[in-house]
Amino acid sequence: IHQFQHNGRSFRANVKNAQLSGEAGRYVSTVAGLESHQVRPLYVRAQDPKTQKPYAPVALTKAATATGFPPVSSPECLSAPQTYSLQGDSALPTAVYTGTVFAPSVTNLICDYLPSQLQNALGLTDVYAAGLNGKGQTIVLVEAFGYPTLEKDANAFFKLAGLPLLNKSNFSIVYPEGKPASPNAGILTGWNLEMALDLQWSHTIAPGAKIVVVVAAGQDSEDFQNAIAYIADNQLGNQASNSYEEDTDIVAGPLEQTSWDEAIEVATAKGISVNFSTGDSGDEGLGTPVGAAGVPSVSPHATAVGGTSILNDVNNPGSTITTAWGDQFVVLMDYLIVLSNPPSAALTVWDPPLYAGFFGGGGGGESIFFPKPSWQASLPGKGRQTPDVSALADDITGVPIVITFDKQQYLEFGIGGTSLASPIFTGFWAIANEKAGWSLGQAAPAIAALPYGGVQDVLSTTDQTRNNVTGAITDENGVTNYSASEIFTGALYGNKGFTSAMYSIPGTAAVYGFGLDSSFTVKKGWDNATGWGTPYGLAFIDAVVANAK
């Protein structure tokens, strides 16, 4: 057993497979637990561009919520094209940029979807009108530690949203291994935010379904595998959402991969779709085709849920654009520290534009451990491919939650990650199971078998790129023009199907790029950015049920 470091974490792991000698050995399929990897939740929080910190929470007071959610957010993330002239402290360089504007810089509203707004964006209004809302189904959420105000926070959220409240008839919490020693363990480890997100948004999607929260006693992989086994043994529901990850496929060893897969396989064999988030870091710098397939989402018996962004279409008001979740950032102008005595800051137009990096995107990739299952025979490569499907995950186009800190309830805005995508998709699957009247089983092969259009394919469109930001910089050498793609030099991997929007406030100008998920790119049919696509309304529900008959 050796010590390793990965993604800034230290852990121990065995470098050789463990063997059990003696007669008992033939009764043991897997030895796990020799390593100290821990499972981590996959939520992310958007930063306020003005402060570079998470958005300030809003206290849930009677005054703030007298008419429902306080008016501090809007799903209108983009606004009409404008032209900005940039001038720093020196005469040159100067710049002129034209294109779509990131609306918060104009409106001062947080770009977020409230429950009714996201329901509408996902085509669920027609689903509910058809009498479908998950009734008769149970959604299982797999979490760690728990926290004391989970139900209270959720009901505060649902009251604001006008959704059915939780009670003993539609909600329960179980602790298969007993409650943690400290009731605040979930708060201290950050699992409270994860649990709030999963509960509040799975119920938003399928408000008629019951919800059972299965709480693991710790963060070790064995704790979660035991939780999945408990779900299978007790047939708690036809769908389970798991918004967490242990490691990437290339780091986790075969023993750990096998132990996860066996637990998931048993649940799948009992008709349960075990859905997992795929991660929030794109290909983690590993490129394609391998990428960064996550454990446990890479199990061929799991359904791997990746991420999308949902943006308003400035060319067609009332419509939305769905892209792969992949946020890139380019700085056009800001303050540059001058190494003088004393140091000073000079407002500087960047020449050329300064690529500031990748700020998050849906995970995925090809397994080097699991071969392709039969239902992925038409896909590239030799290994299990992820994701299978995607849903909203971008924290920049995120959602709010209600959470309690220091005995005060707050609304937190800008929450996302594939931690959001998994409960959204699981809510859809509960509605599909309701419509079917029987358990549809694992979602991944069912989605792979759908005729084209059954799940909404995420593709690059003209509307998506029409008003992307372009610019011209003037310096001592003359004028240099920059196309939308040239502004994102180094970030595209050949991908031209993205949306960009400019953010400009005094002292700062930048461009957001949406749909740039590291080396992953969208294309017709399955792709490593969004899988087969994203569920949308009755078209998805009806297609799944019709194809299963």
Predicted regions mapped to residue ranges:
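Substrate-binding/charge-relay-adjacent region of secreted/lumenal peptidase catalytic domains
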Residues: I1-G307, P352-G416, S422, W438-Q442, ...
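Internal, charge-rich low-complexity segments
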Residues: Y43-A64, N312-I337, Y452-L492
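An often Trp-containing, charged/polar helix-loop segment at the C-terminal end
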Residues: N433-K524
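Short glycine/serine- and small hydrophobic-enriched flexible loop segments
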Residues: T426-E434
